[in-house]
Amino acid sequence: MRRPGQSALALALAGLVASVAGCALPDGEWFGAVPTPDPTHFRWCNSGEPEYIDPLLASSTTDLKVVYALFDGLTSYGPDGRPMPSLAERWESSADQRRFTFHLRRDARWSDGAPLTSADFVYSIARLLHPLTASRNVEAGWKVRHGRAYTDGTAKLLLADAPPLRAGEVVEVLPDGDAPPPDSNLRRARTPLALRAAPDDNTAAVWGRVPAGGNVTIIELGGADRRFAYLHHAAGADGVYGWAPLAALDAPHDAHRYQVRELLDAVAARALPVDRRRTATALGRELLMLPELLGVSAPDPYTLVLETEGPTPTLLDLTAQKALRPVPRQAVSRHPRRWTFPEHIVTSGPFQLTHWRQRDRFELVRSTTFWGRSEVRLERVTIYSLGDQSASASLYHQGGCDATVANNVPAAWLPALAGETGGTRRRDYTRAPFLGIYYYIVNTERLPNAHLRRALAHALDRSELPALLKGGQLPSVQLTPGTPAAALTAADRALCGLAEDSPLHALVVEAGLCYVPAPGPAFDPLRAQEELALARAELGEKFPTRIGVKFNTGVEYHKHIAEWAQEQWRNHLGLAVDLEAQEWKTYLKATVAGEYDVGRFGNIGNFPDPEEFLSSFRCASPDNRTRYCDPEFERLLDEAELEPDRRRRLALVARADARLLDAAPLIPLFVYTQHHLIRPYVRGLDVNLVDQQDLRRVSIDPAWREAAP
């Protein structure tokens, strides 16, 4: 069972943290005494309590350490962080990079023994894109043909002829007069209800009536009698589900007429000099939102076909990440709000969840149904949910865990661990590059004036950050992380067009292809004062008297950086700044709700591509916490997504990047480095640019001393 509360471990660590942090770190070859390992059990110190372990909802690095142990994908992350075959044994793509065919393993199983088939991917991608799911990862699904329109509720399947349109066509629905477009999946009342039903004579789009206050999920088509719809009403802990006759359901919009037009794919639409899409009228009952209209199909149980809006050479890179990992329909349908609890969860990865105690730990055991179970060396995995760096590193020091996740060590300890304070560099400490950027987000609804936001950005002297952070981080005015010019090879510098002494960094996307991210406002106190004066003139009495900065607890340098920014803005701009620390989950909810002025944030890329870092600033992105919305930024990214030439695509992305940074809804601060503590007996816990580890490769070597140099 998952139970809230503070564990005995956390209480015991309180005194331990004080004792370790209160004095200089003891010198030695290793950080703490190396315990005698259990060759079957791996203990991992995570950086906090996951917000979600549902792959479609998980978004933070804290979530993913658990998610990737439990759920498999078409591909998984290899030792270098790039995709390698997993549930998909092989794949091929069309010459225009718009159709991708994956051939699935026939021995893949869910943990309840059910076969894992292509239908599970179709279901999961439709669930990802469904507006009721409200996934912050939905942009990954927008690559799929009609994905964006499906989320927006504007793409429908026409169920009856409406000349010149024919039944079965995917159409875009437009309002007819003042009537809103019909939404076949939402009931226009206090409680939404998702419904699916196939056409039966003239009965198609329907609305259901459920008790007030109930929650909702998805209704699946099924059964021989098409006059029945399967509905799921999630009430209380588990909910109820079953079949309901269509005659018992409301259909308030079925008699409304709507303008409908053919929905061309984005490439065809762009090619038309004039909008010549056919338009007709249809009844609400003749329109239905169905997953079948998406560019996702399952020709047979072991073949999955994905069709995209435009050329998508990066699609394979997306197949390893959380949003495209399948979820079990059989568990989600029965327990929509509790399906990830140990007593209900059904998984597909190398490990199964047996115990979850909130703010304490996850207990996992080797899966007996995982297709690659013979390759899994561990019998047990314990993942501690330690939302405090000092507690995590202290538990490691005392032999309580075998490794820490990236950057779960206090910044003040890093110089000693690296041997930079005169002692010995600890052999179990690793520092490595990281495809991640740390920045401040600015709520553009609370601070709508771009001059004020630019003043904040120009007033920060980022050159002071390395001394504050102590971990080799790279100060940055660029959003997309990369490699400093001085650290690039001569050939890559030539490719990127950078001199060795350039203050900029660059991202080598692939061999022969380089992206130099656009720089944002750099430190310039005079320019900051000029922008501030313009802001005061434009805002007048609406100029804010105080600005708030929020950050999450658990990582000590978030507070240090906030105090540094507070001082910089006071000294260079004369602004009064209030600081507020919040627990991790509370902080996430506050930023999503827009309850902040300035907040700390970070983004770790899944693969080396600048769109990984720009997409969350799109107008409709569920993860757009800044509320920034710029039609020209949207247009440039839309055009880039459809551009088959990769160099021209990056040129368009660079223009969007520059426009975003000039508007300053975010303020880049530094490129992350990653810091790990890993016991010498741990094997296969890969340190790579994207910080993704596959626990199926991890093992414990009890004879490590014999192999040590």
For each of these PLM feature ranges, what is it?
Residues 45-95, 103, 126, 344-346:
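N-terminal lobe/hinge region of extracytoplasmic solute-binding protein
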Residues 676-709:
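Long beta-strand-rich cores associated with HINT superfamily self-processing modules
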Residues 365-366, 448-567, 571, 655, ...:
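Append "and occasionally in soluble cytosolic enzymes with long acidic Gly/Pro-rich linkers
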Residues 354-365, 382-445, 463-469, 473-474:
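Extracellular/periplasmic solute-recognition and catalytic clefts
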Residues 90-166, 259, 270, 305-307, ...:
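Aromatic- and charge-enriched surface segment that lines or borders ligand/interaction sites
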Residues 263-292, 299-303, 310-382, 388-391, ...:
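Gly/Pro-rich hinge or "lid" segments in bacterial periplasmic/extracellular proteins
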Residues 209-247:
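SH3/SH3-like beta-barrel superfamily modules
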Residues 35, 426, 433, 454, ...:
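Extracytoplasmic/peripheral linker and loop segments enriched in polar/acidic and small residues
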